[in-house]
Structures are given as C-alpha cells and as structure tokens.
C-alpha cells in the first residue's frame, strides 16, 4: 500500500468508521481514538493487508478495539447532551428518534449490537461480518435474528406503555 492509497482509505472510510465507533461507545474522544488506532494499524500492517480488503480490515480492527473497551468497562458515562442537536423549526425531531433507537440498541448484548450496526448501518454482508468477528456465517445470522427479535420485543413493550 502506498501513501496515496492510504490517504484514499482515510478519506473513504474514516467517517463510517467514526460513526460505527461513536454509536458503540457514545464517546466522541473514544470514537476518535478507535479510528486513529485502526488507521495506525492499517499503516503498520500495510504490506499484509490485501488490496481491496482495507475496509474490512479497518472495521475488524475497530470492532475488536470496541469489544476490548466494552469488556474493560470503559463505556462513556459523561454528559451525552453534547452529542445532541435541536431540530430545525418545522422539521421532525429525527434526533429524538435516533436517541430512542440508540437506547433500544444499548439494551442488546454488545456482540448483537455490533452485528446489527455492521449489517444495518454499514451494509456489511453476513460473510464479511463473519470474517471480522471470527464467527461462522450461520452464527452471525443467528445473532442478528436474536437481536432483531429482542428489538421487536423491546419496541412492543414500549408500545404497550404508550
């Protein structure tokens, strides 16, 4: 990988990688750290990463770093209001809906949450997710099925309350 190819990867994937880390950790600083560490590892291993597999490599590294941080209990517990913005007048409050979805996702086990985010937010295939997480493709499908079932249950419980 040349410097120009690396720069192209940074411009192409940094935003998606950042969103993935931010949704998982809910900390701007930690998300930036994850992105920086992921790209650092890509550069350090540039000779071993196959051409065309850079995105998969970056998300695999980010996923593993996120899992490590969650296991160590370093989830963000500060003021989340810094991540919120007010909707423009006359526009629906999509941020409120986004926060609600984030809360629902937070109720899932970390692995299920990460897989849902990789599949539904980032558009990865089951095969790509299996490679990233070192699970079989069948296991990935089962975890996603369980996560979606749990989300339906959670949303159903909310509807009964409302």
Language-model region placement:
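A short, charge-rich alpha-helical start-of-domain segment used by transcription regulators
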Residues: 1-19, 23, 29-32
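Structural recognition of an alpha-helix C-terminal capping motif at a helix-to-coil junction
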Residues: 19, 33-40, 44, 52-64
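Residues within helix-turn-helix
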Residues: 29, 127, 138
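Arg/Lys-rich amphipathic alpha helix in sigma70-family domain 2
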Residues: 60-80
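Acidic, proline/glycine-rich intrinsically disordered inter-domain spacer in sigma factors
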Residues: 72, 81-106
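A short pre-motif secondary-structure segment
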Residues: 115-119
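The alpha-helix within a helix-turn-helix
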Residues: 130
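DNA-recognition helix of helix-turn-helix
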Residues: 133-157
């Amino acid at each position: 990988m040349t410097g120009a190819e690396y720069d192209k990867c940074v411009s192409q994937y940094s935003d998606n990688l950042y969103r993935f880390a931010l949704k998982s950790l809910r900390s701007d600083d930690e998300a930036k750290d994850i992105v920086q560490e992921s790209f650092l590892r890509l550069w350090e291993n540039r000779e071993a990463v196959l051409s065309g597999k850079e995105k998969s490599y970056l998300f695999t590294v980010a996923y593993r770093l996120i899992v490590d941080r969650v296991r160590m209990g370093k989830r963000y517990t500060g003021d989340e209001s810094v991540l919120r913005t007010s909707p423009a007048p006359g526009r629906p409050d999509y941020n409120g809906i986004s926060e609600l979805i984030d809360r629902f996702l937070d109720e899932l086990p970390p692995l299920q949450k990460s897989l849902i985010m990789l599949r539904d937010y980032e558009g990865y295939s089951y095969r790509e997710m299996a490679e990233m997480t070192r699970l079989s493709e069948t296991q990935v499908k089962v975890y996603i099925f369980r996560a979606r079932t749990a989300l339906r249950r959670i949303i159903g419980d909310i509807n009964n309350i409302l």
